[in-house]
Amino acid sequence: MVQSSLANVGKMIFFILLQVLIFNNINFWGYANPYIYILFILTLPSSTNRYALLLYAFAIGFAIDVFEHTGGVNAFATVLVAYLRNPLINLLSNQNVDELGTSKFANFSFLQWSVYIVVLILIQHLSIDLIESLQWHNFWLIVERSLIGTLISIILSAIYILSFPPKRQSEI
């Protein structure tokens, strides 16, 4: 338990540094930023305690907010994604993660993985962009910006997942 918690904290620090030092300096067309740090939450084991998951989400989101000076926007978006993560796993796997303590998350098909990643990254980008703008008159511009950011984040996430494949049973 303690060893896995320490490993998760180390992984969280890695994603914070990756986001802050590399991906915060990438701005596509002055329009969209990739948010790769969300992979920390998306790749945590499905058996992770719900409260620990929300705590990890708040911690990584808050750390990104501190470095980006965004006043809680990333913390909100990351906690929202963490909150919606298990219900989406339940929906995609036809199993209840809360009852079983574990799921067939590691055995997701490519389509299930794709839906899981796309939906949660899109939710993250939409929530960040909507809160940052606080305007509805540019709604379609916000949606366009979110879709471009989501696409870039998904491509970078796929590169990361293919470069560092998760362990089948213990990692995810």
Where would I find each of the regions flagged by the language model?
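Terminal, non-globular segments
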Residues: M1-I172
